[in-house]
C-alpha cells in the first residue's frame, strides 16, 4: 500500500509547478493515522494545499489526518500532518510508523539499546510508550513511513 501512496504522490507532484509564482502547491491526503492505538490507514484521494517552500524541500511529501489525542501537545486531533517519506530515524523525532501490515500510528521514536520506543507527546498521562524489543521479533512488524515535517489544520477545523 505504501508504494501506491508514494507512487500517487509522485504523480500529483509532477502536476505542481512551484516556480509558477504561486505561494502554494498541492499534496495528497491519504487518510487518517492514529495518535493513540494504531489504526488501519485508508487511502483517500484528496489533495490539499501546502506552502511551496515545503513542497520544494520535501517533494515526495503527503498528508495524513491525525486522529486521536496521544500527540496533542504538538499535533492536534484532526490536523493534517505533512509526512516526508524516509526509512531513516533521527532519535526523538516524530514519525508515522506502520505497525503490522496496514495499521499506522504517529509517535516520537526513541532508539533504545534493545529496541525502539514509540512515545506519545500528550497532555493526557494515560498514554504510555510502546516498546518493541529486538529480541522479541517485534521490530519486524514495524516500518517507518516517514517523518512528520509540518502540520496544518483543515479549513473547517473547529477550536
Language-model region placement:
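Acidic/glycine-rich C-terminal interaction modules and beta/coil loop segments
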Residues: 54-159
Amino acid at each position: 500500500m505504501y508504494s501506491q501512496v508514494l507512487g500517487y504522490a509522485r504523480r500529483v507532484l509532477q502536476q505542481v509547478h512551484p516556480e509558477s509564482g504561486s505561494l502554494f502547491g498541492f499534496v495528497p491526503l491519504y487518510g487518517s493515522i492514529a495518535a493513540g492505538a494504531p489504526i488501519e490507514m485508508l487511502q483517500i484521494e484528496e489533495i490539499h494545499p501546502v506552502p511551496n517552500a515545503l513542497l520544494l524541500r520535501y517533494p515526495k511529501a503527503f498528508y495524513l489526518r491525525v486522529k486521536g489525542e496521544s500527540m496533542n501537545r504538538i499535533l492536534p486531533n484532526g490536523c493534517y500532518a505533512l509526512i516526508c517519506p524516509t526509512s531513516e530515524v533521527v532519535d526523538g523525532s516524530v514519525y508515522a510508523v506502520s505497525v503490522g501490515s496496514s495499521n499506522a500510528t504517529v509517535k516520537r521514536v526513541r532508539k533504545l539499546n534493545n529496541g525502539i520506543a514509540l512515545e506519545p507527546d500528550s497532555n493526557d498521562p494515560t498514554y504510555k510508550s510502546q516498546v518493541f524489543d529486538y529480541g522479541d521479533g517485534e521490530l519486524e512488524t514495524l516500518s517507518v513511513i516517514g517523518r512528520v515535517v509540518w502540520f496544518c489544520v483543515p479549513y473547517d477545523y473547529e477550536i
